[in-house]
Amino acid sequence: KIKGNPTKMEGTVYSILIICGISHFLNDMIQSIIPSIYPIIKDKFDFSFAQIGIITLMFQMASSILQPFTGLYADKHPRPYALSVGMCFTLIGLLMLAFSENYLLILLSVSIVGLGSSVFHPTASRVAQLASGGRKSLAQSIFQVGGNGGSAIGPLLAALIILPFGQHAISWFALAALLAALIMIRLGAWYKARLVYVVTHPQKNVTLNNDISKRAKYGALLILVLLIFSKYFYTSCITSYFTFFLIDKFGISVQASQLCLFVFLAAFAIGTVAGGMLGDKFGRKYVIWFSILGAAPFALIMPFANLFWTLVCTFLSGLIIASAFSSIVVYATDLMPDK
């Protein structure tokens, strides 16, 4: 059983990895709803693109910029059930967003939704690594593909549920948040037992990379952070404005634009899995270089292509950009395995 005192603490705990992947799927599916509703709220409230950008800024600050701080706190003060608490924030934010009727309330709502994600990611990633049994690339791939799969399916669900029925239909996704919170209780129970197990069964062979200076570690980590920043900058631009670009340039419907966004996000999910496998086979460094350089030509071609080739370029750029995520994260955990 997973709950209570788990019977398996050593080796790869596949049941926990699968639950981590499912939790990540639900979390990122909910998070991807935010940019998916931009066309709705822009038309309903007559927002400018600058106002949409500020909504994205508030959402990203809460969901991404806060993550290092919540992760630092989680390192020093592990809270196994913080996963469920974070998802409760997301649930509250969704309900607020569904019934927000002014700009400030929308900003507050998306910030609360983002805060839930910021609490979720560091602890869930730690649980996945603890359950890996040393197979870090496998664990990271399972965890990441869950999140990217959720990000891909979110716009489809928005097109099927929110676009036809309006802003209030966002409240239906609170059920997904509730389900995720319940699932995360089981993760929290395993994590709590694991913390006790680590205290009573100290590891003798944990390598902390003490032969590398702290300055070199943080220098390498800074490079990895800059790489992640550049990739998320591009990804955030696509998820926030790609639908508007397609609607304006090609005159397609909002529903069709969401399906086109799904093409990018699906490629992102595929690229994460493929990149993890290629990194293990050919070396993470080469995958990272390919990811940095390979997407640029398609991004440059995209504004000048017709709809078909725009989607082809979108798919290929998403595939290539996502390929390095697992490698970058594993590099970071190898640099600082104790954090």
For the regions a protein language model found, what residue spans apply to each?
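Helix-loop-helix hairpin linking two adjacent transmembrane segments in secondary transporters
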Residues: 143-193
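Conserved MFS/SLC helix-loop-helix module at the cytosolic interface between two early adjacent transmembrane helices
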Residues: 65-103
